Structure formats: C-alpha cells, structure tokens
Design a protein with these regions (language model features):
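A short, exposed helix-loop element centered on a Lys and neighboring polar residues
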Residues: 87-88
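Conserved glycine-rich Rossmann-like NAD(P)H-binding loop of the short-chain dehydrogenase/reductase
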Residues: 23-37
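Conserved N-terminal Rossmann-fold NAD(P)-binding element of oxidoreductases
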Residues: 3-7
Length: 113
C-alpha cells in the first residue's frame, strides 16, 4: 500500500511511518523539519501543510494519516486548515481506503500560549 503521513519527523507520526515501513509499505512523509527516517521505501517532503500552493502532485495513496499538529498561536492554521487541505488534496480520490485524523487532549481542553 501507499501511505501518506503528516508530521513524520518525530513522535507518533515517525512511529506510524516506521511501522508501515516495517510491514513493507511505501510511505511518504510530510513535515516542516528534515527527514529523520532513512528507508528505501520512504519519501520525505519538507514543507508546511499550511502552504496549499506548495502541495506537490503525487501518485494516489491508499491511506492518508493526518498527524501533524502544534500547540501554539498557529494551531488553527496547522491543526485545522492544514489537515483539511491535505485531506482535500490527497484523501478525496477514487481508491482511497482510509483517512485517519490524529489529535490530542489539547483539542478538547485547549491551553494558553
């Protein structure tokens, strides 16, 4: 399967990517930071998901996992608008099997900046 994951440079996103790679899938990761995964089946795109004009044309994916998130003054632009943008561009296509959204307790509780 072909899997797209946002927020793959560390944490949950990196762990998810490594799991799919271990199972033999092709993974494309998107993150503002440089790649932290080195694998023959991994492609890293260094970009900010808020910048829709930078979204590259990519081959269709079977699974899209929206994992990128921040907890600062940019949270609406990244956590909401960026997630919507990625889903519209890559998740709404014929043949898509799953679109997963990953969030945190901050989405329910919020916090001060």
């Amino acid at each position: 399967m072909r899997v797209l994951i946002t927020g793959t440079s560390s944490g949950i996103g990196k762990g998810i990517a490594e799991k799919f790679l271990k199972e033999g899938h092709n993974v494309t990761g998107i993150d503002r930071k440089d790649a932290s995964i080195q694998h023959k089946n991994y492609t890293h795109i260094c970009m900010d998901i808020r910048a829709k004009e930078q979204y590259p044309e990519l081959e269709p994916f079977d699974i899209v996992i929206n994992n990128a998130g921040v907890q600062n003054e940019e949270d609406i632009d990244v956590n909401l608008k960026g997630t919507i943008g990625i889903t519209e561009k890559y998740g709404i296509r014929p043949g898509i099997r799953s679109v997963l959204m990953i969030g945190s307790a901050s989405g329910h509780n919020g916090s001060g900046f």
